[in-house]
């Protein structure tokens, strides 16, 4: 059963939060079912907290509509992969309990979202840069490093200077946090060097 927004707001008020956003799969579900007014009403409710309000989505067309209609948001949480393919109109798996085991991400999704984000002046937090690890499937460690740097180039080369990229890590088998940070530093230094040339 979906969480009661009023109850959630009372709980959030006690936490000294620095921002809040409308969860992406819920945004997309409401959008796909022609219930955008509910999204807008929730955003207005979130605004009462007095902190920046964001909108999460997996769909570029949601951001385009939000921008066109002036929805009350300060930032976007934009998934680089459209997790709504083949699930359009369905509620979030967090609500239904439906597994995501067969969820497949498509490489053509990332450029579509990045193209949309180039037109947005508001700050963006891009996430699922590595397609939930699917871009590494069948790759050697060296190929994985190259794939990571290619994604950094594509994503960070497209985002605005103050936008963010959120990268998930799985620490059980190796220190992915350290590896990702080192690869980012390598990529960034190489990019700066190329810009100076």
Segments predicted by a language model, with ranges:
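Active-site glycine- and acidic-residue-rich loops that bind
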Residues: 1-3, 51-65, 98-110
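Active-site beta->alpha loop and helix N-cap motifs at the rims of alpha/beta catalytic domains
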Residues: 1-34
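Hydrophobic faces of well-ordered beta-strands that scaffold small-molecule active sites
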Residues: 20-22, 53-55, 76-78, 125-127, ...
